[in-house]
A protein has these predicted regions:
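Membrane-interface helix-loop junction between the first two transmembrane segments
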Residues: 36-50
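Individual alpha-helical transmembrane segments in multi-pass integral membrane proteins
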Residues: 67, 71-77, 186
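Hydrophobic alpha-helical transmembrane segments of multi-pass membrane proteins
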Residues: 48-58, 77
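Gly/Ser/Thr-rich helix-start
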Residues: 31, 49, 64-67
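Polytopic alpha-helical membrane-helix bundles and their juxtamembrane interface segments
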Residues: 2-39, 88-92, 96-206
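Helix-loop junctions on the outward
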Residues: 40-43, 55-70
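Membrane-water interface of transmembrane alpha-helices
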Residues: 73-90
Length: 206
């Protein structure tokens, strides 16, 4: 039992109780948000915004600037997605699950490269302590996650593929920052994203 405690909580020995509570809240709101997204429930957005605001604070404290940028953009895109998912015409939802077109694929690539570019210069401008592979992973996942969020806001099936890829990359990134709880969260995110892809694909064929 002591070994389990050491594994999960020893890395938090220097953290305030408030920060530990906030990380647990981000953990649960993040998972709840993905569950709502999986079910195409609009509550994905208010729960997700709570998670992103908390996560921005936590990432600021460990200088993961790419993820601060990601979560700021999550919040902005979530507001758009909230509005977009709620739109109706003749009492029928306007935005439904679909695959992206070649034009939307091009837009997604453009969003990805813009975010990678911004995240790269954000690291250099703020002179973060992260170098080499960790810095590169933070920049890469920034581009992946913002692009995935944009695709989700437009109910594109491919958003889940990007979430899966980004989640798998993020797990070791958070482990290297002693964010054990958030690392476990991203393992759960990966499982939920796989399930969500399957569910959205089924709804696409209906």
């Amino acid at each position: 039992m002591g070994e389990v405690y050491d594994f999960f909580l020893s890395s938090y020995s220097g953290y305030s109780r408030v920060d530990i509570v906030l990380e647990f809240l981000a953990f649960w709101f993040g998972i709840i948000s993905v569950v709502f997204a999986k079910k195409q429930n609009i509550l994905v957005y208010p729960t997700g915004i709570i998670c992103t605001l908390i996560t921005m604070y936590l990432m600021y404290k460990v200088s993961l600037l790419g993820h601060i940028l990601v979560n700021l953009l999550y919040t902005i895109i979530s507001l758009f997605g909230w509005w977009n998912w709620s739109r109706r015409e003749n009492n029928d939802l306007v935005v439904k699950v679909s695959k992206f077109t070649s034009n939307e694929f091009t837009k997604s690539l453009l969003i990805f490269f813009i975010i990678v570019f911004v995240a790269y210069f954000a690291h250099d401008f703020f002179a973060t302590n992260f170098e080499g592979q960790i810095k590169e992973l933070d920049i890469l996942t920034s581009g992946i996650f913002v692009t995935a969020m944009w695709l989700m806001a437009n109910k594109k099936l491919e958003n889940w593929i990007l979430w899966i890829i980004g989640n798998v990359i993020t797990i070791p990134l958070y482990l290297s920052s002693d964010k054990i709880i958030l690392s476990i969260q991203y393992v759960i995110f990966t499982i939920l994203a796989i399930q969500a892809y399957i569910e959205w694909k089924k709804s696409l064929s209906k």
